[in-house]
Amino acid sequence: MNFTGQRYWLVGASEGLGRALAHKMSAAGAELVISARSETRLLELADELPNKAQVIALDLSDGVSVAKAGADLGRLDGVVFVAGVYWPMSANQWDGANAVAMAEINFTGAFRVLDQVMPQFLERDSGHIVITGSLSGFRGLPGAIGYGASKAGVMSLAESLYADLRTSGIKVQVANPGFIETR
């Protein structure tokens, strides 16, 4: 795919799949806005990329942090939400704090990011939204209560966006990868 002349916000860019996508998209001509929690990792990544990249550190569990990031975005052609956290948790080892944290980042974080881009996409009737779900969002898996539930929510969000926007100029995609070892 050729991204020449296009500006994308890549959320969850500091490591793993997000970092790999940043390299691929930049090599394909995209000007990126890269976001994640670690500004240090983002600055290192920006230095590695062949095209210009704006660094905006944020915390997806904090609505104020995401809104502040949104204020610095400018015009975008698309957003790729690949951020996510996973902490193994079975029903027998219930950890409510970790379950809520996964939902805050993986699911609510997607809403917060979309809140920053949807107004401009709707105004122009143009944009590209890519949201990363997971194969674990299709059905329950052992040891993945918080993660699987949050990814099922993200997948439903993407499908609902697609249903509402499919006849518009806004393209919506969901990617549901299997297990990817990122650390």
Show where each model-derived region lies:
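Conserved glycine-rich cofactor-binding loop
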Residues: 14-15
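Conserved glycine-rich Rossmann-like NAD(P)H-binding loop of the short-chain dehydrogenase/reductase
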Residues: 30-45
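Substrate-binding pocket helix/loop in short-chain dehydrogenase/reductase
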Residues: 90-92, 98-103
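Active-site loop immediately N-terminal to the catalytic Tyr-X3-Lys motif
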Residues: 92, 141-145
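Active-site helix of classical SDR
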Residues: 114, 150
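Alpha-helical segment proximal to the catalytic Tyr-Lys
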Residues: 119, 163-164
